[in-house]
Amino acid sequence: MRIKYEVSAGGLVLRRNGAQLEALLIGRGQPRVWSLPKGHVENRETHEQAALREVREETGCWAEILSKLSDISYWFYLNRTKHKKSVHFYLMRYLSGDTANHDHEVDEAAWFEIRAAKKNLKYVNEKRLIDLGLEYLQAEGTGLFETETVALVTEALQDISAS
């Protein structure tokens, strides 16, 4: 059997919206399957460049990378070929843009309060990225977002670990 190897990159994009910390998700299909924005690394692109490009294309939003989060690998079958896909995920901060400007590859891009984002994500490995992102923000302190955000992160971590 043939095996095809694929490399993708994507991001967990966060923003503060009033008293909430929000994550940017993409939705496909009906009913919606929610996931993090990601896509193939193109020729001569770094993983970071691909992650930023895919976030911009799939969500209509610009972001900046704060940190590498994790690599996720999984297997799937397509057209009688076995695929191994590795995805490099980054923690990102929202800069600008409008989710209405997402591209045709997704049906919807939307902001979710961080706990709702974790609940709505389809894939367990992506749910874990929410935890990793919150843990990173808590450890790094307030320099990445406004001061009040650390309290939101701590509260979200407590709620998520209790559920």
Predicted regions mapped to residue ranges:
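Charged phosphate-binding loop/patch that engages nucleotide di/tri-phosphates or the phosphate backbone
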Residues: K119, V124-S163
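Short, charged/polar low-complexity linear motifs in solvent-exposed/disordered segments
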Residues: H40, A51-R53, K82, Y136-A139, ...
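Unchanged
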Residues: V41-R128, D159-A162
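N-terminal strand-loop-strand
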Residues: M1-L36
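Residue-level marker of positions within ordered structural domains that often coincide
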Residues: R16, L95, E135
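Short acidic/polar alpha-helix capping motifs at helix-coil junctions
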Residues: R15-Q20, K38-E42, R80-T81, T154-D159
